[in-house]
Amino acid sequence: MFFYKIIYFIGFPYIVLRLIVSIILPIASLYFIYCNFIAPKLREKPESSYKNKVVIITGASSGIGAELAKKYARLGCKVTIVARRLDQLEKVKSSFLKDYSRVNDDDILVIKGDLTLIDDCKNMVEKVIEKWSKIDICVWNAGSGSLIEFSKLQGDISIYRDNMELNYFSLVNCTHLVYKYLEQSHGSIIVISSLAGKFGTALRTSYSSSKHAVMGFFNSLRNETKNIQITIVCPGFILTEFHDNLKTLDGKQVERNKGNFMTASQCANEIILAERQGIRELIQTAKGRVGNYLQAIFPELIEFLTHKFASSSVKK
């Protein structure tokens, strides 16, 4: 009897392992391939379907926002560009009209706005509806960052409130205001989050916490709505003014190693394709994608690697 018990305890794990290898792994692999490579192609909307769609892009005065605006304008969309710097927005609009002969002055709406102010958010939506009577795509791109060593805050956590106001609460406010219009048009929201919203990262407790809040809100909202597509984008390091404007707590400019940064144009191309294919979440770096899969299995390893990578991205 004892001998049979030994055989059972040795044999049962072996049977389970055989079951996993021979049945579960092949099914899981096929499902992974279908979800990540086949289904997006089947869902992909043709470029021609974007003609006359109404698009709002925040943080559009430079970088990713400006590149997205240009590319949506080329697709024939009616584009609203929003930012705090009116002069820079006008330059972006002028570049549209100069570079793309098919884009007319009336196709681009420029709105100056501080999205941490609810009145500016309301004004943005009212002007878009007044001009075009609908909203099809919203790109929430405005944001700010900071590098802070938590132990050196000296009692002042205002930078945390500032980051949350722009990176999180402004997105919630704007989404609330456009929600009914997007439901009517079966529209899309593109949220520019960050890898800092996927991984806790050294020196980025303020920025990372705001981006984790963004991820939580829009993943939850996706479960509430059937008529609005939500695509969350997690870029890596992009060659934009965002990094040029990044400062430490004492106001000093942060020097970055930009050798492996992605261009804003390449980033924008991937974002537009992800929305066309109905992608739920776009992680734009290979390291980020691998880390996302491994985080649940090897959390200590991922913490070590993110700390090393984050520290190496800042010049000493």
From Swiss-Prot:
Which residues are on the Cytoplasmic side of the membrane?
A: 1-18
Q: Which GO terms describe its cellular component?
A: cytosol; peroxisomal membrane
- Entry's Gene Ontology molecular function annotations: oxidoreductase activity
Q: Which UniProt keywords apply?
A: Membrane, NAD, NADP, Oxidoreductase, Peroxisome, Signal-anchor, Transmembrane, Transmembrane helix
Per the UniProt topology annotation, the Peroxisomal ranges are 40-316
State where it is primarily located.
membrane
Per UniProt, where does substrate bind? S194
SUPFAM superfamilies to which the protein is assigned, alphabetical: NAD(P)-binding Rossmann-fold domains
Q: Which domain of life is it from?
A: Eukaryota
What is annotated as the active site? Y207 (proton acceptor)
Q: How would you classify this enzyme at the top EC level?
A: oxidoreductase
Q: Where in the cell is it found?
A: Peroxisome membrane
List positions binding NAD(+).
56-80
Q: What is its EC number?
A: 1.1.-.-
Question: Which positions, given as ranges, span the membrane?
Answer: 19-39
Report how it sits in the membrane: Single-pass type II membrane protein
Q: Which Pfam families match?
A: adh_short
Q: What does this protein do?
A: Putative oxidoreductase.
Family annotation (PANTHER family): DEHYDROGENASE/REDUCTASE SDR FAMILY MEMBER 7B, DEHYDROGENASE_REDUCTASE SDR FAMILY MEMBER 7B
Q: What family, per the record?
A: Belongs to the short-chain dehydrogenases/reductases (SDR) family.
* Name of the protein in its database record: Dehydrogenase/reductase SDR family protein 7-like
